Structure formats: structure tokens, C-alpha cells
Amino acid sequence: MTKEEKTLKEYIFTSESVTEGHPDKMADQISDAILDYIIEHDPSAHVACETLVSNGFCVIAGELKTTAYAPMQEIVRRVVQEIGYTDATYGFDYRSAAVLNGIGEQSPDITQGVTLLDGEIGAGDQGLMFGYACRETDVLMPLPIYLAHLLTRRLAEVRKEGIIPYLRPDGKAQISVKYIGDKPVSVEAVVVSTQHAPEVSQEKIREDVIRDVIRAVIPAELMSEKTLFHINPTGKFVIGGPQGDAGLTGRKIIVDTYGGSCPHGGGAFSGKDPTKVDRSAAYACRHVAKNLVAAGVCDRVTIQIAYAIGISAPVSIMIDTHNTAIVEEKKIESCVKELFDLTPKGIIKSLDLLRPIYRKTAVYGHFGREEEGFTWELTNRVEDIKKYLKIN
């Protein structure tokens, strides 16, 4: 440790992720699969789709304004099958689960506020949204949530590819990272809870998970002999998925975003079309934040924007660079207002959000993803920002 590091604050920060077979994430994926189907057939649709999965059944509720017909039963069963609930012995399977449809029509009171006479789109609700970016990883995300998502994605991979064939779909991971100042330096603890077949010993599960999951994705230089591994710390984890816990859309909002590294406005994403600023404005905030950091304006930034229902322009914009900016924050705020159209219509157009891209966002985080379709992760405004702020 350098002399400078000794004077900096030391702390441990923890984030978690869950697998695609976690009941809350099952609900998110079902809601977004329904959204994808509807938006593919009717891009102007308004969708608010909520899902409940529990012991042997699934309930779909919410409001639609669309000309499309969505085969709800077929969509639900396909998602559950693709996740991996294919056997009745898992306690929930795509063939036998009951599917109840309680979808209704969107209130005309909401419709009139969203569809404005001048062609603009009013915010679908009031609310506040946050975006964040930092230099802890190549994708400009905090390290703890980034690593937690790598673990849960790997749990699904080793299950589906037969590397650890006795695993079942439900699972969680948690990472505790030590910081000195604002710099992550080591992984202090890893927690993995994974559903499994009943005949497998905990000793074998521990050995396989440490070797094929943890060490496969966490860089060796971040771990040491002092790193703690807690694998299924309660003992066996046979009963899982909707049989073990009910799942609801929108209950993993910190997993979906930054793992607790920045504030959250409280609005969930899944099942909502992009006129809902809970979703689209949070994506826009991330896009702005990532481009500011990528442009070298700051090393870390938190952005908040807020809306009133039926009003297109944000009622407020706040930028906090955590004392890492090379220009005044007021100038950065002016830059953002000038270069980024943060009306719902502007966000939808600039990020190309009227596409069936949402189910894949519903697991392993909405941010820090480099797959096709995650337009809010593009650093395509860097040169515009540099030019406006007159920085190299």
C-alpha cells in the first residue's frame, strides 16, 4: 500500500445479482417477453404488464392500449421453458403451470396525457430517475455489480451447457469488494446460492462452483487466500423457483441498475413500453452519464432527471460529478441540456426504443451490456461533448 493510499478511506461495498430462474426475474422476463411481442406487432402500443409467479401458476395483469393480439399463454410457457423449468420435479414447469390473464385496457385519462396534440409524447407518469457511470470497469460500471452479473450469467451457462449438470435454474450471487478511496482493490467475499438436484453433496457443489463459476469469471488478481467463499450457506437448496418463493415483476430494481452504487428513483423497468419514463429516462440517464465519463469530462457521475405526468420536458436535471470533473458542473449541465433531447419522444427516437429488445434486458442488468440493442450503452456522443465543452 502506498503512502497516499494509507490516508484514503477504506471500505467494503457489496452488490448482488440473481439468475434467470429466480422467481422475480422469471416475472420480469415474462413481462418483457409480452412487451416485445406487442411492440413488434404494434410499435405505438402502450404497455404496462405485471407478472406474478407462484407455486404452480402465473398471473398476468396490467393495462394495454394496442391493436395487436398477444398469445399470453404461449408467451409465458415459452419463457418458462427457455429459462429451464422443464421438469415437474423442479416444482414448476412450463407444461403444467396454470396461466391466468387479467390484462385490461389503459385508462383514457392516462392516454390523453401521453398522446399530446402537438405530436409530442407526455411522460407516462411523474417520477425521478437516475443514471450513473464510473471508471471501475471497461464498460464504465461499478465493479461489484459487474462481477455479480458475471457470476449469475456463468451459473446459467454451466447449467445449460452441462458443465455442472445437476444445477437447477434458481440462484443468486453476491460480491463484496474492498475499496481504498474510490478504487476497488480486492474481492473480500463471494456468496453463491444455487438450486441443485437432491442427491448431490454440498461438498461437491462447493468444489464445482468455486472452480467452474467463481474462478472462471473473477480475475485471479482480485482474490487471495483470504477471500471468503460462501456456497449455499444454509445447506441444501433443492426447493427453489416459484415453488420456494413467489416472484413479482419489478422487485429486483437494484440488481437491474447499479447494485446500490447510486440512488434509485424507485420505478421498475420490465413490462413497460418506452413512453414510461421509469424505463426510457433511466436508459437516457445512463447514456448521458456513460458518454460524459467516456469523453473524459469526469471519472464518475450521477445524474437525476424528473418528470410530471403529461409534460414532455423534464422538470429538473441534476448532475453530480463527485468532485472528479475537469470543468464546472454548471457547464456540464448546459452541455447535457443542449446535446441530449430528454423528452420521451426524443429519448425514444435517439435510442431507437420502439423495438422488441426488452426481454434480454430483464436478466443480468440493464446497464454495462455490450450486446446488440443496448443503444443507451453506445458512446456515440463523446465527440459532441468534447466539442461543446472545448476539451481534448
Swiss-Prot record:
The membrane spanning regions, by residue number, are none
Q: What is its main location?
A: cytoplasm
Q: Where in the cell is it found?
A: Cytoplasm
- Pfam families per UniProt: S-AdoMet_synt_C (PF02773), S-AdoMet_synt_M (PF02772), S-AdoMet_synt_N (PF00438)
Q: Where does L-methionine bind?
A: 63, 106, 245, 276
Keyword set for this entry? ATP-binding, Cytoplasm, Magnesium, Metal-binding, Nucleotide-binding, One-carbon metabolism, Potassium, Transferase
Q: Where does Mg(2+) bind?
A: 24
- Which GO biological-process labels does this protein carry? one-carbon metabolic process; S-adenosylmethionine biosynthetic process
Is Protein biosynthesis found in the keyword set?
no
Q: What does this protein do?
A: Catalyzes the formation of S-adenosylmethionine (AdoMet) from methionine and ATP. The overall synthetic reaction is composed of two sequential steps, AdoMet formation and the subsequent tripolyphosphate hydrolysis which occurs prior to release of AdoMet from the enzyme.
Q: How does it assemble?
A: Homotetramer; dimer of dimers.
What protein am I looking at?
A: S-adenosylmethionine synthase
Taxonomy of origin reads: Bacteria, Pseudomonadati, Campylobacterota, Epsilonproteobacteria, Campylobacterales
